[in-house]
Amino acid sequence: TNTLSLEDHVSVIEEISIKHPSLCISFTIGNGKTPLDANIQAYQARKNEKFLVKKFQIYGEVNNILENSSLNDKKVKILHIDINDSSGFGNHLSPYETTIKVMKSYVLLMDKFLEKNSLTFFLGGDNFMIIAADLLEKDEISALLNSISYELDIKFNCGIGLGRTSRDSAKNATEALDFIRKLRKKGQNIPIYEIK
């Protein structure tokens, strides 16, 4: 999803090494039909010390690098989610209790979306980003979010972004979420919006 070749990964590590010589980093490359598949492949390559470039500690499977992937032309789907009116929690919850509610949301998002081979990340505050399986449709996303909303008595806003790269998709997802927020300020409630 980052569309970087193996050579691109090497040049990134070289540049970081020049700017920050005391920093030691490594990359693990994996891809698959779903984000979870890619994560598992990357994990296995790292665990089994399958180096693509040992000098720079780049791990992966030769047949998984971008140039050989049949997955190159697929679009990446990313969701940018926030909790609607989480600042309003302060009217009846302490900051600690608010944090618990946000963390419970995170755990449930991870659990529900992992069942759909998608990976959830906490961005801070009340924001989450999900690298979604491309087969996950808007209606299914809505149903998953509604089930969590019901369980925790909260509401989510969800921007869905599609793009050729993860950067494009994340940008589109954030723009979609910003659009939802603008509409909310005008009194319109659209909890999910998608930009392709």
Question: Residue ranges of each PLM-predicted region?
Answer:
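Regulatory and interdomain segments flanking nucleotide-handling catalytic cores
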Residues: 1-196
